[in-house]
Amino acid sequence: MSRFYLVKNYEKMSEKAAALLFAQITLKPDAVLGLATGSTPVGTYRKLTELYRAGRLDCSHITTVNLDEYLGLSAGHPQSYRSFMRKNLFDGIGLSADRTFFPEIPERLSDCRKNIPPSIGGIRNETNQDIETALAETCRQYDELLRSLGGTDLQLLGIGRNGHIGFKEPGDTF
């Protein structure tokens, strides 16, 4: 069930979101949390880190699943979403890497600029179809992982100024 909260400012939003996550983890210490990246949740992650450092939050049994990852960046790249999450939350709450999940981009697609040739006149070639197949398989595997975890107990999303969620822009089909 979705709930909406109207708050005064970013700081209050961060506090409210952190309080909701804190409550979920308190009620279910092995919660599966869906997390997002970007500027919106940074304040929330900072609040959770403060709760952890104060000894009020135990995250040792939670599992996290992130919305997305960049195609073309390795997991260790400083601009990857894994790096973002380690810096902004995981390291601050002592969360082990084996309890965090991201879409696994096939290694052979790690440098997409070399693997995705331009199409001519919108005609797809075999390489593009191979890449689409590999990405569809990545999505299928991530869906399977989410099902095996029983879905998410709580999903944190940021909505951009233009209404985008993740890389889904207004007008995109789901």
Task: Please report, for each region that a protein language model flagged, where it lies by residue.
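Ligand-binding beta-strand-loop-alpha-helix segment within the catalytic cores
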Residues: 1, 57-154
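N-terminal glycine-/serine-/threonine-rich phosphate-binding loop
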Residues: 1-33, 50, 100, 114-116, ...
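Gly/serine-rich nucleotide phosphate-binding loop at the start of the catalytic core
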Residues: 10-11, 39-43
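Generic structural signal for well-ordered alpha-helical scaffold segments
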Residues: 18-26, 49, 53, 86-90, ...
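Short glycine-rich or small-residue beta-strand-to-loop segments that form or flank ligand, phosphate
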Residues: 32-36, 65-68
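Glycine-rich beta-strand-to-loop/alpha-helix junction loops that act as flexible
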Residues: 35-40, 157-161
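Glycine-rich loop at the start of a catalytic domain that most often binds anionic cofactors/ligands
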Residues: 42-56, 78
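Class I SAM-dependent methyltransferase SAM-binding "motif I" and its flanking Rossmann-like core
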Residues: 166-174
